Structure formats: structure tokens, C-alpha cells
Amino acid sequence: MSSIKSKTIIEPSENDIEKGEVDFVSSSISNFEEAYEEGPSLKREFKSRHVNMISVAGAIGTGLVIGSGSALLKGGPGSLFIAYLMTGINLYVVLISLGEMAAFSSDDKGFSGFSSRYVDKALGFATGWNYFFKYAIVYPTNLTAVGIVIHYWRPDLNVGIWVAVFLVVILAINLLHVKYFGEVEFWLSAVKILVLVTLIITCIVITSGGTPVHHKIGFHYWRDPGAFAPYLVEGSTGRFLGFWACLVQSCFAYVGSEVVGIAFGEAPNPEKTIRKSSFQSLFRIATFYVIGVFVLGLCVPYDSDILSSNASKGNAAASPFVVAIKLAQIKVMPDVINACLLVFIISSANSDIYIGSRTLYALAKEGYAPKILMLQTKQGIPWVGCLVTSSFGLLAFMNTKSSSATIFGYFSSAVTVFGTINWINILLSYICYHRATIVQQIPTERIPFRSWGQPYIAYASLIFTGLITFFNGYNAFIHGFKYRSFITSYIGIAAYVIMILGWKFTFKAKRVTSSTVDFRK
């Protein structure tokens, strides 16, 4: 689904974008108009508590719990905190923009439906496939991460064994009735919230001196070694690059928060549910992301040898929260956190298939993919889409051999770009939707809710997201040109542009103007 977010670790690459999780993320909602619907619709069997929990914990994944360690190492605690705060504000604008459109016209055609209806059919085509490939790529990396985490306890067993086991288990969960899937995700999300709250409280206790070493830290590490670390070069330029590295990684941690959008398409009473869930997203951002990285920066210095040596590992040792616990000399916790990471990653992989299958369903319903992808079980599960998405999990077996894993690591680094492009699509769709409601003088009573500052904050968010997407590959040009880093940083943008131009030239698609948007219900 939105979210959670993630981004999961495999082989480290030159690309600055972290391969943390991609924990719960997503894509599915759109046109409400019955005239547009062809074939069966997804069943609205998510309960309100399912959607609410997903909106709070959906995108929380290893991008935050593990990936933030690399960002802290590169930028320091000050850069980390500011980056997560800025990206969090930006994400909130994306989510309330999505919420406004979904509350006005919620159904199951996905983000591509919004783009097609309010902007251009070509953009709708590119949006849908961009979003599907994001999850098709990240799913095998999450399966690999499951194997790596279990390898922490059973190093004698090949990672491929666990990849095969969970490939079957996660597919089986996704073929369950949607209400049972919602129940599974509800409890997985509840565990994630409990773990993060525990980690945040633990960091507060550590910085306050309530540990075996009884050392009160406070803001000591913000003064020595400092709040802002130089990255790649020294001086003010290096500190700015450190901040930018944190900004890119924070996008990776946040990407997928739109996950709540897919739940809207299968939720009863969508107008009420969407409004509530959109505002709950602010609570999640403030509590788990911003406060989480703030207390983390109080407990771990960016020049920590333990942080540096563990940054490339894929298990609990790579988590900066574990580094904080080790520095405080608290025993046992690494094993506990490793078990918790397993829950995070399984939830992420679980939602990858859910989101991928619903995205394929939406593409087929819009006419952008074969109609066979709309086939459902009696319980309303798009089983063909589940099988197609799950088949990408076979790529995870590439990671059982180090030579292939390095190549695949570069490929998976492109996930963040696919995610931020989706934010851009949501914002473009919202801006066009907002303009159309004004041009066509849609009565206020027909608009369930409109947030403060629109559409100006949407324009600001669009510029912010565009800059990060375009300059995310900055490190490919420093200290010599790195072609692998360049390719993984910009292949998503190239594919996106090619899909738009290909559809426009093939089908002579014309842009939808504000006066021609169809608002009929």
C-alpha cells in the first residue's frame, strides 16, 4: 500500500539511495464513475480499523530501522533530523492531495485512474506501470532480506531455502479473502508500532543515562563530533552533500506511504474512512519518523566505528538502533530486534504482492494491460495478478550468489526513483483535479474535504519532489563518473518518459483539459 513506505538490504552499491526496505506501499484508487467500470470490481471488505492501522503503520519498514544508519553516517544527526522533517512535510502534502481526490471519487482503478481522468491517458499508462515495476523489483529484495535475517541465527543454511519457503507462504496469504489479509496486516502493523515505540523509548532512556553505564548523553553528540557531517568532500560543500544524502535516504524510507491509497479501494464508506486516515498519516510521520531519527541522533555519534562497520550488513547489526543499544552495553536486544526486523520485512513483502496485483488489476481495468489480469476468485482476489507479481520473486534466487547479487543490488537501487515519480504523478493529478473543480464550478458540498493551502502547497511539494528525483544521482559525478550509479539513479526517469511518449505517439492521446474533465457520478 502508502506506505510503508520501503526500502530491504542486499548488496551495497555505489548508488547513494539506500536499499532499506520498502515496507508497505501502494497504489489503487480512482474513478468512482460507474460508466467507466468494466467487469467485476474489488470487494469492499476491509474494515475501518484495517485501513486506519495501515494508514498509521503501513509504510514503516527497514528503510527507517536500518537505512537511517547509513544516512546518519553520511550526514550527521542534524542533517538526518532536518531531512526527515522536510520529507515528512512533503509527504503529508502528497497524502492529503491523494486523500482529497480519493474522497471525492474512490474506486479501484488505481493511481493510473486519477492520472488518466485528470491529466492524460499517456500519464495514466506510465503511472500504473511505473508503480507496478516498483513493487515487482522490490519484492525479490524483500524475500532476500528475509533469508538474510534468518541467516543471523542459522548461518549453516543457504539463504535460497528461506526465499523458497516465504515465496510460497506470502503468495498463500495474498490468495486469502481480503478481510483475512487485512487481519494479517493489522497485526503485523501492530507489532511494528510496538517495536518502534519500544525503540524510541529505549533511545530516550539511553540518552537520559538510564543504562548500565549510567552516562547521560543529552546533546553531547550534536556538539562532538557535531550535528552535520561532511560527505565525499570536506567543508561546507561536504556538509551540504551529507544533508542531500540524508534527504535522498529519507525519501527511500518514506516511499510507500501512499499504501493507504490501495486500501481506500476496498474500504466501506470511503469518504469518511479516507478523511480520517489521511490525517492519521500526520501522526505517523511526526511520531515514528521525525521523533525516531531525532532520538537516534542523540544516542549514536556519526563517527562511531560500530556504525561504520555495520552499515553494509543486512541483519539487525546494521540497525543504528542496535548500535545505540550496544554503545549503552544493553545485552540480548540485538536478537530481539532481529526477530522484529523479520516481522517488518514479511509485512513489506506481503504488501508488495498485494499492491502489485491490485495495480495490475487497475491497469487492466483502464485498458493498459491484458484483461486476463482482472480475473478474480469468488472472494474477489485478483489471482492472476497475484501470480504474475509473485513470479518476480524468483529473481531473489539471484542473490544467493554474490556475483549476481552485486548486479541485482544496482538494479534494486532504482526503486526510490520509481517511488518519488509516483508522488509526482499524484501531485500532478491533484493540481489538475483542483483546477477542474474551479473551472467547472463544482459545488462545495460535493467536495468531501479540502485541505488548507491548496493548491499552492501541492505546487511546492511538486517542485521539492522533482528536485530530489532529478538530483538523486549526484554522487555519480563526484570523484569521477560512476556509470553504474548513474544508470540506477536515472533508469526510472528514462523508462517513465519513454512510456509516456510511446503511448502518446501510438494512440495520439490528448491532454485532458479542465473544462473536459468528467465529474459525473
Curated annotation (Swiss-Prot):
It is a multi-pass membrane protein. The lineage of its organism: Eukaryota, Fungi, Dikarya, Ascomycota, Taphrinomycotina. One of its GO terms (cellular component) is membrane. Belongs to the amino acid-polyamine-organocation (APC) superfamily. Keywords: Amino-acid transport, Membrane, Transmembrane, Transmembrane helix, Transport. This is Uncharacterized amino-acid permease C777.04. It is found in: Membrane. InterPro entries: AA-permease/SLC12A_dom, Amino_acid_permease_CS, APC_YAT. GO terms for biological process: amino acid transmembrane transport. The chain crosses the membrane at residues 53-73, 78-98, 158-178, 186-206, 282-302, 336-356, 380-400, 407-427, 487-507. Coiled coil: none annotated. GO terms for molecular function: amino acid transmembrane transporter activity.
